[in-house]
């Protein structure tokens, strides 16, 4: 789910839940507080397709994508899901400076492709600090994921 973002703000990931009900939560939107903090955010360099519903027999085509940062100093946190198979074109998505993230433990997936008939296996995990999600291809769970820090202070 891609929620609306207020003008001047950007998202660091989209929202996912394990059912088809109306979205019941929100995501974290970010905005530079001043000129110095602009360097903490960066638009993605590219998008990598993580999953498509090809082979599932679903009535609507869908895909999940994860951005890649332009620089190793930045981390792109959340994945996005969208209709169709074309690469996203999101001007309001940003990656964050590495000093703003931390490793978090992995809980159970909020969604997986198990039973969908999809040719690609993927698990979707919730990032609790940013309230976004991260899609991981394959059947195995990662040991940890990266999310925004609970304490957002940073010096560099």
Where are these predicted regions, by residue range?
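Peripheral, non-catalytic segments of secretory and membrane proteins
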Residues: 1-156
């Amino acid at each position: 789910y891609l929620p609306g973002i207020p003008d001047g703000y950007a998202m660091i990931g989209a929202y996912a839940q394990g059912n088809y009900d109306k979205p019941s939560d929100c995501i974290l939107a970010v905005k530079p507080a001043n000129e110095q903090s602009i360097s903490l955010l960066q638009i993605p360099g590219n998008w990598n397709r993580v999953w498509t519903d090809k082979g599932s027999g679903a009535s609507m085509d869908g895909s999940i994508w994860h951005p890649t940062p332009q620089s190793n100093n930045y981390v792109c946190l959340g994945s996005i899901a969208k209709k169709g198979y074309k690469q996203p074109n999101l001007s309001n998505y940003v990656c964050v400076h590495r000093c703003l993230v931390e490793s978090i433990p992995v809980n159970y997936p909020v969604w997986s492709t198990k039973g969908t008939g999809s040719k690609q296996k993927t698990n979707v995990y919730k990032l609790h600090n940013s309230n976004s999600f991260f899609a991981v291809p394959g059947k195995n769970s990662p040991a940890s994921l990266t999310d925004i820090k609970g304490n957002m202070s940073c010096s560099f």
